[in-house]
């Protein structure tokens, strides 16, 4: 008989709720500022008519730096945010047409999703060919990732729950016909809650940006959806063109002889 588990897996709402609450902490707000700085370098160069923020872990307009006018935020529960049109929907089942959105931003949604593959497939479905996908997630190859090995498994730190590396994201996106444009990261301080300690370690920021630019606590991955190259089917040839010439000659001869007998 199988013994019961001591730690039950948390649901997506539990993990999302704890991470959302963590973003209200001082450390969480500092990371969010760094992530918005990353988005500020990426979004202005992406154009189109419709932009979608998929998932709302923070009550902020993460599409603020985008030049696209129509901006949507979609999730199962939403807080009103100025500049974003709300769409109540599951991130893995959107009421949007295929190939209808130019830019999709996933803000730590894959870190808390019970089925990240399904979320990625849905983002791919609604994206136009040549549309762009921006993924923000916690970086396992950072000081924050190393921090996992020094914490107990029951720790409430949200980023310990599910960490997906940029390399794994790249593999998944390749299978979905995406080209990875590039990856950047931000916030090179360790995840310590004491502000005084973070200030004393502030020298790590310029050092990390210079020598370990993809080793920040949070990464932003930009990918472009490929254009499907469809081979057009040949039109069906008329039936007479498909018949052999000999058969055509025989058919015409029989028609002529029949016409002569009637005359």
Regions found by a protein language model. Give the residues of each.
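Class I SAM-dependent methyltransferase Rossmann-like catalytic core
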Residues: 1-44
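Class I SAM-dependent methyltransferase SAM/SAH-binding core
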Residues: 37, 41-94
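A short acidic, Gly/Pro-enriched loop at the edge of an enzyme's catalytic core
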Residues: 92-104
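A short glycine-rich, Lys/Arg-flanked "PGG" loop and its adjoining helix->strand segment in the class I
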Residues: 117-132
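Conserved class I S-adenosyl-L-methionine
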Residues: 132-160
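Short alpha-helix
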Residues: 160-183
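Conserved catalytic loop of SAM-dependent methyltransferase domains
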Residues: 180-205, 214-215
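C-terminal lobe and adjacent flexible extensions of AdoMet/dcAdoMet transferase-like proteins
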Residues: 203-263
